């Protein structure tokens, strides 16, 4: 067995607690949704099971028929579609059949019971790499970060008055939003669904929390009783003082009960009236004994004011008032209004907080409503109103919420995203079933006849096939795959949109610490909206991201007590860094630097609550692979982590000398390498498979990938690392994959490089390389392209795959087999035929004499045209595989397709001028020149450098990590014949250690050495920093971008050449280019450019003729775009005509006489003279 790479670790902090599996969340989310490993009757109420239980039982409106749900089963697809690779090859979906067991109870037929298993459709199956194979393509469903349901409070300042206005939003998972808010007039109102506004007290009566206004006052205001007799006595001599005392006590309060004059029966004060000076004077005059009232203090003014403006007195009036706001213009009755409001807030089908919303609500308002209660309760509403009132009163123990805090944002995984779709589909199905129950004949009804599962299947297919969060997997290399699955997007359905997202949402937040990486996010319009999960982060059952900490008690770190905390559990805690110094008893020493909210404080050890588990926990996998990350500017680190994902797997991979210790875990968790599931002995090994026999003599077969094509046309190939007879343990690595070497992720190569200018060839980040990198295939990669052709049935007959192609020389067919398909191993170049195909031409009725001749000499071969599959321009390679699918062999193909052939062509690409390369620190550049190795600068021992980079690329970019990497790489290159090390992020090798290792290996401590010019052999004036840098070749290869056109397709209307490489287009000569030619007065060139080289149809045909015959150039005709301009004038209803010198009208609309199949076609030049490209209109199936 080959020995795996062992790294010398420079990390000083021992990690406490295990790093979770990098794909844990994706795999668990889908398993929780499907519960495949549970038997149907033992499944928990979550995911699919929950969705079915919410919809069933379905009962007909008259109660005669009832459809009940028993359970669902998942059945594996039949061979060969139960294999991932086969699904990919055949363009099929890797899925399970969903069958649901239902019970139909028919009361009309004397409670007759029918049980049956109904096929509901296909549910895609997740591979163990957390991907889905949909129509042959591997896809990933990205997790979504969205606003958590629950309640949140916010503050705004009124611009006119400068007054603070507060609001409390109750946000359900699904249903109507409620927002209680104060306004400048001190009223408390509620917005229903963010637009319809009513007074809060009206709403409270409408939802039947209170019967009338008095009940509301009893709840919010304090009831007091004042005995006046004693006061009359006390202030009998001082009537002024009496008035002041009563004013102070009663002014602004509300009378609770009517106060009558006992003799006359007249009202002294009416119930529900505000008490003012006039009322107080009446009380004194009439010597009223006592008064009971609702006390209105500053804290209850809001409710009292609102009630004063509330014109509704009863629940019925309130219900009607709310209904009028919700449905203005609709006919209103009390019952219909009440029913609408009940449905809106108290029907779990329409209003659903979900357990997470209930959890947040209970936590925020300090309630203890049971978690099963997912609709709105009285406690929720009153708690929210009370909190808004407390905020308005400026109380100490209340605060508004930060919407960008991760305690208010949660993750929806694959399972939950799919569940949302499925609930929608089932709801549609439910509606259809109810309709069918009323229309179908009750005597013959069966579960199958009632169900129409099409809407459900359409939604599942939509979600996986074209949903915003289901993405074509980035398969450039194992790291790209892994980070794609760990990506977190704030976009997508129910999320933000790029245009609406402001700066705050995108910014790094203190709650991201250890949860979302502050570095890895795309550059461009999505910055900050798409993030990546941090290395140690997990996601809890409510969807909040948690990060692990070590518990600290009385200044001692309990290193075995690792706890995962969500963002809201971290509030008010002092959390120390992972590198805090501990003594041998794990006691914290000295003053400790801690995080406290978004502040950094220094405190005594006894006050510390928790401590980080590892310095790595802050960053994502991609950023965690950058050595000396702590010495790089964040902007460059962002580029570095994004560019590692674009690295092309090389033909000869090599693990980095300077790693971070994450390389092995990435290789294993991404599924790039093959690990064994059992312990045992290797009994068979070759390039295609490895067989391991366990202790019970049972054989386990591990198939290896052989030159498979990835989504990004990279080559997926696995190589065994074990030999026959080797003993292996479960979890051992037995085969290397693409971009891995001996079990470690290996995206690039260790390159000897120097920082120096060289003849201007590294100006502006350009890279000068040695031709050794080409000769020794150092940066050579294999790319596999796929070319596909279908033979269809057309109106004129069947297309045929054949070797007999009209007007094609024998040499062009030399590599085709007898069926017209290219042979594996053939070398092909641009224009070569891969698959010969002919299509029938439209045939006219032959004349009588031809019919006679045909009758005598037999049927003449029908006229066919060549529609073969050829290699596109600029492509070359070797045919490595051919996949044939045909109806004859029983393969499923699209409608109208009889045979489908796919040809895989592999191409070796060496590094070349124009290719993009980079290091791991965001130091990217383009190869500017490939220099012969002997001309490159060389060291004193004669070793030539491989790469020369510009030293000016370092200081302004502030990514000094690359310099440290180069120095340490130089030392490790010669240590024990090449040593791989790990320098973990934020805990790596120090500057001193780097210098010590350089010295140990006989290099100066500065890391600078004398270099000699390879051309003259002379010393360079100054010493140069030379060392080993790990460099990557990126996916932006010049061969994919280079493009040239002579004659090609034209746009139909303007007749100008198309644009872009994909369309084989030309270079656009825009208005600025015209100005440039005008500035030179180059009138003839300008005329050619605008006519015969572009859209003058007759002119370009005649010009070609003139060139062929060697004649003088003809004059140009009218450009087609001029005619388009005339048409545009006419479309504006302007009558515009074109006249010649004699004022004769020129008819622009005259058709130019071009035949359908151009005769001016010269096969030997492979040039088509006209812009009329025939479209294959005979093909029936235009869906593609």
Swiss-Prot record:
UniProt EC number: 2.7.7.6
Disulphide-bonded residues: none
PROSITE patterns hit by this protein: RNA_POL_BETA
Keyword Nucleotidyltransferase: yes
GO cellular component: DNA-directed RNA polymerase complex
Self-association and partners: The RNAP catalytic core consists of 2 alpha, 1 beta, 1 beta' and 1 omega subunit. When a sigma factor is associated with the core the holoenzyme is formed, which can initiate transcription.
NCBIfam families attached to this UniProt entry: PRK00405.1, rpoB
Protein name, UniProt field: DNA-directed RNA polymerase subunit beta
Native source species: Fusobacterium nucleatum subsp. nucleatum (strain ATCC 25586 / DSM 15643 / BCRC 10681 / CIP 101130 / JCM 8532 / KCTC 2640 / LMG 13131 / VPI 4355)
Lineage: Bacteria, Fusobacteriati, Fusobacteriota, Fusobacteriia, Fusobacteriales
